[in-house]
């Protein structure tokens, strides 16, 4: 409807994006780990999608104030330009003030939602969420300062008042507003929908596959996956990593104890292979090595002689696969039965505790730790499961406290404020259950990207709750004796329309993630579009 207002919002959003990258670079200089990665390619689009929401709310509310001013004091003003500078100043100031309070709550919850990415075990997601949170703050700052200033400085378009903003009550607004007369029906329908969603939530699984983080359109990645699929002869081995004076009497004793522990463990298969088993096999064909090993005894010189030889060129030809370059670390490889991620995590925890106890009892300065691809994947998967609970729970608690605090201040009554805050919070939690339920029913898995979908749903969804409840309170103040249907219908017809436009831009921005070459980001975009629609 107005290219000027559209340009104002978009230009300020672009400036905010530039400031975001500048701040990210400054934080990097100050020592904060901010790594640019593939996920950050989508940050400008996401900031545009979310940031336009704030500008949209401000512009829509200012135009609404101008319309109301003409209705309250008819002077034949038919376009936006017909208003005097003073009238525009009053409308811009009032619209900005009324919007900024709700936007402040919205930006805070949005930032909390994206900062919940810091609970993720993936560094690229930590940087991704932090940068977006910084960007949202800059966009909010410009939306309530620079945007009103530009609207005041630049003359408005000769846009007819009736076309500047559609605030007429339509059939959809009337129907939504009438729902306040049948709260029981709304609750029953919500429960009926929530039952299958809760069952789907119970079926939701955690899944993590490193292959999803590779772009298989790149030739070198295709070759890597081909080698992994076609030429891998056995499952990836696990490793016991022994640090300390490996080539010593105590080191040999600890090595034997670790091998015995691995061999006796019912969940391991095959014979563990390490430096000493390799040396025993090689001594039959190497007379010099055989002489050194035959001379091993209680004196340290014999062990030192063997260590010195192992670090020579001939020795490294034998020991390089199991012994590092200064003989201070060795690995013992072994196999374990294929387990699911939870069983693997439990296996790692139990075996690590046993090996740590063996190292402590050895009497020397040794450590023994476990490693291996399957253990890493199990640990990452466990972190994903924990992060889903921690991030969602943290954001839910912060939002509940914030809603209770805001309503307590407005109502000037702790009990009524707590009750209203809790009532506002319940629909948000229902949306989280629905989102996770849909993921479970459709076969989506929680991974390192979708782990924060619950927190983001709460963070962005509370925007709509705050905007609508704030507008409802304004309508109550304007017409305290009116019917609740009138309050809700007017709120939906005005703020509700702006919320719908904001939801469209946000969903459109996140849907762009479907063009990402990374499967997890594609899934994240798809799930979040559903989450935004449900939150609205």
Where do the PLM segments sit?
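A generic short-segment signal for beta-strand/edge and adjacent turn/coil regions
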Residues: 176, 182-183, 206-211, 288-303
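Short, contiguous strand/loop micro-motifs
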Residues: 162, 210-211, 246-249
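Juxtamembrane extracytosolic/periplasmic "stalk" immediately C-terminal to the first targeting helix
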Residues: 211-217
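Structured non-transmembrane domains adjacent to transmembrane bundles in polytopic membrane proteins
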Residues: 217-406, 428
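Membrane-embedded transmembrane helical bundles of large multi-pass transporters/channels
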Residues: 1-208, 360-536
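Intrinsically disordered, low-complexity regions
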Residues: 77, 173, 177, 211, ...
């Amino acid at each position: 409807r107005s290219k000027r207002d559209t340009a104002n919002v978009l230009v300020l959003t672009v400036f905010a994006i530039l400031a975001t990258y500048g701040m990210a670079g400054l934080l990097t200089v100050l020592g904060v780990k901010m790594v640019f990665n593939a996920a950050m390619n989508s940050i400008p689009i996401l900031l545009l999608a979310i940031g336009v929401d704030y500008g949209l709310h401000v512009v829509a509310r200012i135009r609404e104030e101008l319309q109301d001013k003409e209705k309250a004091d008819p002077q034949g003003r038919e376009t936006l330009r017909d208003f005097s500078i003073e009238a525009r100043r009053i409308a811009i100031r009032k619209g900005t003030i009324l919007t900024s309070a709700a936007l402040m709550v919205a930006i805070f919850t949005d930032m909390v939602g994206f900062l919940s990415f810091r609970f993720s075990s993936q560094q690229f997601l930590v940087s991704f969420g932090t940068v977006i949170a910084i960007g949202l703050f800059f966009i909010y700052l410009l939306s309530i300062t620079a945007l009103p200033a530009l609207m005041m400085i630049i003359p408005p378009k000769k846009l007819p008042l009736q076309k500047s903003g559609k605030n007429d009550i339509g059939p959809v607004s009337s129907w939504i507003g009438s729902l306040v007369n049948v709260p029981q029906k709304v609750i029953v329908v919500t429960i009926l929908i929530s039952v299958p969603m809760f069952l789907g939530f119970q079926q939701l699984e955690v899944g993590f596959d490193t292959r999803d983080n590779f772009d298989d359109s790149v030739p070198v990645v295709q070759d890597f996956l081909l080698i992994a699929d076609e030429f891998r002869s056995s499952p990836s081995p696990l490793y016991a990593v022994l640090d300390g004076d490996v080539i010593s009497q105590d080191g040999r004793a600890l090595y034997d104890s670790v091998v015995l522990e691995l061999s006796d463990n019912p969940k391991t298969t095959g014979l563990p292979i390490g430096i000493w088993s390799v040396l025993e096999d090689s001594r039959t064909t190497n007379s010099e090595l055989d002489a050194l090993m035959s001379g091993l005894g209680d004196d340290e010189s014999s062990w030192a002689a063997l260590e010195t030889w192992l670090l020579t060129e001939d020795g490294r030809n034998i020991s390089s696969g199991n012994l590092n370059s200064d003989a201070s670390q060795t690995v013992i490889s072994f196999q374990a039965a294929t387990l699911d991620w939870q069983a693997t995590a439990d296996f790692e925890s139990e075996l690590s505790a046993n090996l740590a106890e063996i190292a402590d009892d050895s009497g020397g300065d040794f450590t023994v730790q476990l490693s291996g691809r399957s253990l890493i994947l199990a640990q990452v998967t466990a972190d994903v499961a924990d992060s889903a609970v921690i991030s969602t729970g943290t954001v839910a608690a912060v939002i509940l406290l914030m809603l209770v605090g805001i309503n307590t201040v407005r109502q000037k009554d702790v009990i009524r404020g707590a009750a209203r805050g809790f009532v506002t919070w319940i629909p948000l939690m229902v949306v989280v259950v629905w989102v996770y339920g849909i993921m479970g029913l459709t076969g989506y898995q929680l991974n390192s990207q979708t782990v924060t979908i619950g927190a983001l749903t709460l963070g962005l969804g509370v925007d709509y709750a705050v905007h609508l409840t704030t507008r409802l309170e304004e309508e109550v103040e304007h017409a305290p004796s009116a019917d609740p249907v009138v309050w809700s219908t007017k709120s939906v017809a005005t703020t509700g329309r702006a919320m719908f436009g904001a939801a469209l831009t946000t969903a459109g921005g996140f849907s762009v993630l479907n063009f990402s070459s990374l499967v997890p980001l594609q899934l994240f975009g798809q799930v979040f579009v559903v989450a935004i629609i449900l939150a609205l």
